[in-house]
Amino acid sequence: MLTIDAVGTPVFSDAIDIANARIRFANGCVVNATASRVSLRMERKMRIFEDDAYLSLDLQQKILTLIRKREGSGTPGQLPVQIEEQRLEQGDALKAEIEAFLECIRTGRPPTVSGEDGLAALETAMRITEQVNESLAARRLTEAGLDV
């Protein structure tokens, strides 16, 4: 990971109601993550951009939309794209995680996510939380007329 830039602010409460984090990795990948209690609708989405495709994963509705660039010029006024939509299997993520863990114990197979990767994810989350809290503290100092 190269950089993390995260901010958060209260909107309707004294706590942080909306937070945004931008994570840039050494390989050029950029992640923008937003968590909000003030959104007009409840949604859990992941969007992935590639050179010739865009994937939108709606974790709430369990729908994957894949938009790929098509060869050729297409119809005038329309993008030359192919759209595929797929319903995802309903399931219990926590149950699947526990079952995978137990399978690793039974078979000795290494887990899909290593302990090191889990620790790195936790450290990233903690860095984001720290920056969000720092941004809120700086905002409150500025509002109080104090220089940051």
Go through each PLM region and give its residues.
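C-terminal helix-rich "cap/oligomerization" subdomain common to oxidoreductases
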Residues: 26, 100-148
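Short secondary-structure transition/capping segments
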Residues: 16-17, 69, 125-126
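Residue-level detector of alpha-helical recognition elements and their boundaries
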Residues: 19, 43, 63, 70, ...
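Short active-site-adjacent structural elements
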Residues: 57, 66, 121-122
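A short glycine-threonine-serine/GTX helix/turn-capping micro-motif
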Residues: 83-92
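Short polybasic amphipathic segments
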Residues: 46-48, 62-76
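Contiguous beta-strand/loop segments that form the cofactor/metal-binding neighborhood of enzyme cores
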Residues: 1-62, 91, 95-109, 144-148
